[in-house]
Curated annotation (Swiss-Prot):
Gene label: lolB
Protein name per UniProt: Outer-membrane lipoprotein LolB
SUPFAM superfamilies in UniProt: Prokaryotic lipoproteins and lipoprotein localization factors (SSF89392)
Compartments reported by the entry: Cell outer membrane
Gene Ontology BP, a term: protein transport
Length: 205
């Protein structure tokens, strides 16, 4: 079950391509809206990164923790998860139009999109496209969001499409302030992500 939830977390993490920011944000909190807009614009230019960290899963019938490696190069991604004590591993690679999921001792699965793969393999429908934004400390641009800014005009929390994301700490890397520890609360699923190493890149188009 833990591996299944890890796969879910991985699939939520994927969106290939970028979209522009609209006026779908409801802002509150202590931050300055102008500073937030500048911060958001800077982070939106990031189209590549490498993350090493830990992920924790809490669900009604299962919980556990594992390690996370996430390589993003524009619209290509390579995400690897390893369960506790080496109990299972999963790797998801792809770009728009083709996704491959490899699960240790189980097999290799393909689909045209991460959303399709999630539904085919797990029977679940979840907002697959959002975490690539959330992990940078940004709301996904394609739906309404409620944002709370901290005193530094960065996200303290956001509510979007039935999920709540709390930003507990940030780290500065190469001039970017990026989330270091965040918690995601969804229906019957809580995810904690701790980033041990952020390597952001602006690759260009």
């Amino acid at each position: 079950m833990f591996l299944r939830h890890c796969i879910t977390f991985t699939l939520i993490a994927l969106l290939a391509g970028c979209a522009g920011f609209g006026s779908r944000e409801a802002l509150q909190g202590h931050g300055d809206p102008q500073q937030w807009r500048a911060h958001k614009e800077q982070l939106s230019s990031l189209d590549g990164w490498q993350i090493n960290g830990k992920v924790g899963i809490r669900a009604p019938r299962d919980s556990g923790s594992g390690t996370l490696f996430w390589l993003q190069r524009q619209d290509y991604y390579d995400i690897r998860l390893a369960g506790p004590l080496g109990r299972g591993a999963a790797r998801l690679t792809g770009r728009p139009g083709g996704v491959v999921l490899e699960v240790a001792n189980q097999g290799r699965y393909e689909a045209t999109s991460p959303e399709a793969l999630l539904e085919e393999q797990l029977g679940w429908q979840l907002p697959v496209s959002h975490l690539v934004w959330w992990v940078r400390g940004l709301p996904a641009p394609d739906s309404k969001s409620k944002l709370t800014l901290d005193g530094d005009s960065r996200l303290a929390s956001l509510d979007q499409d039935g999920w709540q994301v709390q930003y507990l700490s940030y780290t500065e890397q190469n001039g970017y302030w990026l989330p270091e520890r965040l918690k995601l609360h969804g229906k019957d699923l809580d995810v904690t992500l701790v980033v041990k190493d952020w390597q952001p890149r602006q690759l260009g188009h």
